[in-house]
């Protein structure tokens, strides 16, 4: 335990890394933005518009996916935003909570894993420690080969358009449509709760949700190319978008973009008169609380990676073990994938 916490590869060490800390700051700013958009009426306005526009179950499911695709910056930010917006919309079309959870979760993570401007891109690229290739560059090159994420998104479209359900999901959907029971299980989260949090003052609009998200994405992209030397006249990537993007410091850039996006959201809602200063300050601790789970998951993942790499030297062991394997080493990726698939079935 002492080694995991205080060693050169322990929790303290990974949290002291500027890139990792940048991702954590980014997650906190996203949590604050979600709470601000809820308090400012952005979720309420978009849900109101969607309720008037969406007329069928298929359209409600596809809109859930589309909104999830548009909010690709972080999977938890995606889940919190899309869940708050689409819950009442899907409820009006008798779509079960289990189906809504599937639509949101099956969109959030895959989209983040194929979006270069996301917290996942920053985290995954950080695992690449090589002078031969940049982490972001490798992340971008693997996108066409990320079949799981791409096929998951295709699967959502097929299931929604063809109205196909099977297994436990079929039971949940049958109960929702025939028995008017959206939950099926004894746990009934959000039952009886107000659909949305109303803005403190004034009437909200769809822009109250879309504008902060668009600004966040834009400032994150600008921050990424800035950190890569796009605006530096002495850099070899001066005015080279692709080169600067590949050479960017993703953790620091996303933290900067998140802070600017959060600041814009606060000022925007102040000028709109949607929330007061006191209300906006309440979003700081509430937003942080919403992001505790992903922060802990990332921290433990970084620690495990550091421990296996520098404490157990697993990479060196695998390299030496495969040195004499000859052509059999080409099967190593398949063996790793098979191991990942079978581990969850072991009790």
PLM region spans:
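Interfacial loop-to-helix junctions that mark the boundaries of transmembrane helices
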Residues: 12-21, 139-143, 240-257, 323-327
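Membrane-core helix-loop-helix motifs of multi-pass transport proteins
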Residues: 91-181, 196-208
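Juxtamembrane/transmembrane-helix interface segments of polytopic membrane transporters
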Residues: 122-130, 224-227, 231, 305-310
């Amino acid at each position: 335990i002492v080694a995991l916490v205080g060693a050169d590869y322990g929790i303290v060490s990974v949290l002291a890394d500027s890139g990792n800390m940048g991702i954590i700051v980014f997650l906190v700013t996203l949590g604050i933005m979600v709470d601000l958009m809820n308090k400012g009426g952005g979720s309420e306005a978009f849900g109101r518009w969607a309720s008037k526009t969406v007329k069928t179950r298929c359209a409600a499911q596809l809109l859930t996916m589309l909104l999830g695709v548009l909010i690709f910056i972080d999977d938890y930010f995606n889940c919190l935003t899309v869940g708050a917006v689409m819950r009442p919309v899907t409820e009006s079309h008798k779509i079960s909570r289990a189906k809504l959870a599937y639509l949101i979760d099956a969109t959030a993570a895959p989209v983040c894993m194929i979006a270069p401007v996301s917290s996942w891109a920053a985290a995954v690229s950080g695992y690449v420690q090589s002078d031969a290739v940049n982490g972001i560059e490798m992340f971008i090159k693997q996108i066409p080969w990320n079949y799981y994420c791409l096929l998951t998104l295709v699967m959502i479209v097929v299931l929604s358009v063809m109205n196909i359900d099977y297994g436990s999901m079929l039971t949940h959907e049958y109960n929702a449509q025939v028995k008017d029971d959206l939950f099926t299980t004894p746990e009934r989260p959000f039952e009886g709760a107000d659909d949305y949090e109303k803005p403190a003052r004034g009437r909200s609009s769809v822009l109250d949700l879309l504008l902060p998200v668009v600004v966040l994405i834009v400032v994150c992209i600008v921050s990424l190319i800035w950190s890569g030397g796009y605006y530096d006249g002495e850099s070899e990537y001066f005015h080279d978008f692709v080169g600067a993007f590949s050479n960017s410091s993703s953790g620091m850039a996303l933290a900067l973009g998140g802070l600017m996006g959060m600041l814009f959201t606060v000022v925007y809602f102040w000028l709109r008169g949607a929330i007061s200063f006191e209300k906006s300050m309440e979003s700081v601790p509430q937003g942080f609380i919403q992001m505790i789970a992903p922060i802990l998951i990332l921290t433990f993942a970084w620690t495990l990676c550091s421990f296996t790499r520098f404490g157990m030297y697993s990479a060196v062991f695998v390299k030496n073990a495969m040195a004499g394997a000859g052509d059999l080493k080409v099967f190593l990726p398949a063996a790793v994938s098979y191991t990942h698939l079978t581990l969850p079935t072991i009790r």
